[in-house]
Amino acid sequence: MADKVIAYASGLESGGVLSVCKHFPGHGDTDVDSHKALPVLPFTRERLDSVELYPFKEAIRAGLGGMMVGHLQVPVIEPIGGLPSSLSRNVVYDLLTDELAFKGLIFTDALAMKGVAGNGNVSLQALKAGNDMVLSPRNLKEEIPAVLEAIEKGELTREDIESKCRKVLTYKYVLGLKKKSYVQLSGLEQRLSLIHISEPTRLQL
């Protein structure tokens, strides 16, 4: 599987599309949908290293650009019961960034999912855990002020946020975003609507 991941992701990135491997540290051998609840990976560290983490390690070794951290409970790495891996500094920073030396962009899974519910301000926790980007926060009106307040209190530093921003901008530059022409917003909805697409084109979709 790792070979297929690397081949597919390398193809994406060679075409200017960021590849994002998911769901770290492994969502394959679970019987719970993290959209609905928090899955548990009740395995030993040896098992995680040899099975769940293996394809991610290979992707990191190949230099692929993105990683999405899933909402998973991994007791052998994060001892706090009920704390999802996406909000765990033990998982995001200590394991992914430090131990596995991943230098690319780190995304959370969608923060509106039930697998991460009940953990307070999840955007703030995700940033403190080491994620670079938070996906689909539930309530931006509450979560942005909480991040700003955390900076004022010293729980996060302005340098932390600026570092994440530079990382995002660097990847946009490397992937050639600056070279792309901008999308014309005028008439965009009409162009994207299936009603206005010719029959042969619609069949191709």
Regions found by a protein language model. Give the residues of each.
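Charged/polar, solvent-exposed surface patches and flexible loops
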Residues: D94, E149, S163, T170, ...
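Mid-to-C-terminal alpha-helical segments outside catalytic/metal-binding sites
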Residues: E152-K180
